[in-house]
Amino acid sequence: MSNNSKIIQMCVAGQRKKGWSDEQFAHEFTVVHAEITKATAEKAPALLGYRQVLAIPRPRISAFNMNNSTWDSQAVLTWSSIEELSSLLKSEGYRANAGNHVFTEPDIVGSISQVAGEFVFDPVGYSSQESRFMVFVYIPRATRSSRELVTEQEVAQRLDNITKIGAGTGLLRYVINRDVTPSDPSQLFDGTPFTNGDWGVMGVTEQYWFKDEDTASAFFADEARVDALMKVPSSLDGKSCVAVAGQETVLVSK
């Protein structure tokens, strides 16, 4: 993927449609929706990447409020720009295909974000894994109505903290993303399944990659480590995190 300051990630956490079984939801998300999105990516050069995390069964992790989590899926779609994303969401082709495939409840958690910093603890271990276990975290702003971007200093503070916490552990890679959701997300998502999403309240999103679930569980089982993880910059609300964890599947990578 090219280094472009306009590249954004559309991140969405979803809950299965009411009454759906594990098997039905897993099929609709990891097979049907996956195939639709891959087909879209073939026709849309602006769709640069697509990653899925299926949180079924629930992982054995309690950090970041995951012990009470009701979230079944996490999708991360990488776009060349927010303008390109907006253009596709408004296209007839999208609305006739992906826009009609609804497999989650209307109330979703979402963020339009940009990578702000990262640290790879084990480059060889990360690159050699065909499949990894990922923990995706949404950290809301302390003031929900604020649209101020998290500062460079706060990003650096958080990155430095995680770099110290993750050293010598099973954590392979960490990425922090700054939320850049437009001030009026309804204009972007009007007429799409994302209209009722909880957009614009997040300050940052975070991604933690591990070799497997056992390694991730061991990492988050350390209470002192988790306490340190929950110490976030003052503009953020660490107590109200939303997190989704599961095996990551990379479906599109350009």
Swiss-Prot record:
The active site is at 33, 50. It catalyses: a chalcone = a flavanone. It is an enzyme of class 5 (isomerase). One of its GO terms (molecular function) is isomerase activity. Signal peptide: none annotated. InterPro entries: Dimeric_a/b-barrel. Its EC number is 5.5.1.6. Chalcone isomerase; part of the gene cluster that mediates the biosynthesis of chlorflavonin, a fungal flavonoid with acetolactate synthase inhibitory activity. Within the pathway, cfoK acts as chalcone isomerase (CHI), the key enzyme responsible for the tricyclic formation of flavanone through Michael-type intramolecular cyclization of chalcone. The hydrogen at C2'-OH is extracted by the imidazole ring of His-33, which induces the oxa-Michael addition to form the intermediate enolate through 6-endo-trig mode cyclization. This is Chalcone isomerase cfoK.
